[in-house]
Curated annotation (Swiss-Prot):
The UniProt record lists the keyword Cell wall biogenesis/degradation: no
GO BP, sorted A to Z: tetrahydrobiopterin biosynthetic process
GO molecular function annotation: 4-alpha-hydroxytetrahydrobiopterin dehydratase activity
Reactions performed catalytically: (4aS,6R)-4a-hydroxy-L-erythro-5,6,7,8-tetrahydrobiopterin = (6R)-L-erythro-6,7-dihydrobiopterin + H2O
HAMAP family reported for this sequence: Pterin_4_alpha
Record's protein name: Putative pterin-4-alpha-carbinolamine dehydratase
Enzyme kind, highest EC tier: lyase
Organism: Sinorhizobium medicae (strain WSM419) (Ensifer medicae)
InterPro entries hit by this protein: PCD_sf, Pterin_deHydtase
Similarity field: Belongs to the pterin-4-alpha-carbinolamine dehydratase family.
UniProt superkingdom: Bacteria
Keywords of the record: Lyase
Length: 105
């Protein structure tokens, strides 16, 4: 079953609960920049997120350089944001806990 695209009010409500996630200018995706203590921590984060993404059958667009992981989430089938994006965002936030230096949270 195809996920349903969220309306602006539902997106705003979801974002209000999420720390650090930003709505893209076009309203069709959310993004967050994660910074870790080391490359190993960034890679461990990505590995944990990859397993979560597989379970949800929803995959991020991400970019990694050393200790930085920039993530963009959207649901291409719905041409916008769905509950899947916010579920994966929450899983990513959980995976990042304890891996990021306090000054980078």
């Amino acid at each position: 079953m195809r996920p349903e695209k969220l309306d602006a009010a539902a997106i705003a409500e979801q974002l209000h609960r999420m720390e650090g996630w930003v709505l893209a200018e076009d309203g069709g995706s959310i993004w967050k920049a994660f910074r870790f203590k080391s490359f190993a921590e960034a890679f461990a984060f990505m590995t944990q997120c990859a397993f979560a993404a597989e379970k949800l059958n929803h995959h991020p667009e991400w970019f990694n350089v050393y200790n930085k992981v920039d993530v963009t989430l959207s649901t291409h089938d719905a041409q916008g944001l769905t509950e899947l994006d916010f579920k994966l965002a929450a899983k990513m936030d959980q995976a990042a806990e304890g891996r990021m230096p306090d000054h980078m949270k």
